[in-house]
Amino acid sequence: RMDIYFPKSGTPTAIILSCPGGGYTFTSIPNEGVAVANFFVPRNIAVAVLKYRMPNKHEEVPLSDAAKAMEILRDSAVVWGVPTNRMGVIGFSAGGHLAATLVTKFPTQKSRPDFGILVYPVISMDETITHKGSCLQLLGDNPTQEQRVAWSAEACVTDNTPPCFIVHCQDDKTVMVENSIRMYQALTKHKVQAEMLLLPTGAHGWGFSKQIAQKEVFESAMMKFIYQNL
């Protein structure tokens, strides 16, 4: 299911697909979906909030949903008058893993986002830094090393990965900040445009509806990144 939010008037300058978090057990729609739309729509950016299927140890399911959603949005953009090269994805926590997977493992060119925004994302399935609950739901109880690598976004970055903006709090006790650091390093290695903002405090799960210190710094940097990639 995908709920789409449009500006009240005029043609949107871009469309962003929002992938809420929830540890691959549910989708945190209010905080990381509706609140996302409430932020972007007044800035003339349409938002599609994706309620993707849970993997239940079938790792390909969420990516299939996200890729299909991006293809639908790109096809629909022609009708809506939105340039088809202004299609981004934003993801939070486990939804950040889904967004990172989409920007690195997009199954078709049409499903490739033009930019990605990763907010306190789960990136790696490496057992030393992964979010164990997300890994369990995605890969099951005893994933092979091959599975861990295949679904670690940092291991899937290529020269064709789109530009990414990453934000994480250093005091995040739910998803280790090393996830974002590894993703940034992989993007840099492949010379992909990347920006990473590390905030000293804020913990996890604040989304777009909760205030944290330096929230305005994040919002300003993120919007600058988006405009640079439109």
Predicted regions and their residues:
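Catalytic nucleophile-loop/oxyanion-hole region of alpha/beta-hydrolase
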Residues: 28-37, 48-84, 209-217
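Active-site nucleophile elbow and catalytic-triad environment of alpha/beta-hydrolase enzymes
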Residues: 141-156, 161-162
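Short beta-strand/loop motif that positions the catalytic acidic residue
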Residues: 160, 166-168, 172
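Conserved alpha/beta-hydrolase "acid-adjacent" motif
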Residues: 173-182
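C-terminal catalytic histidine-bearing segment of alpha/beta-hydrolase fold enzymes
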Residues: 3, 181-230
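Short beta-strand element of the alpha/beta-hydrolase
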Residues: 13-22
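Short beta-strand-to-loop junctions in surface cap/lid or active-site-entrance loops
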Residues: 2-12, 80, 154-158
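Primarily recognizes the serine-hydrolase "nucleophile elbow" in alpha/beta-hydrolase
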Residues: 68-134, 148-149
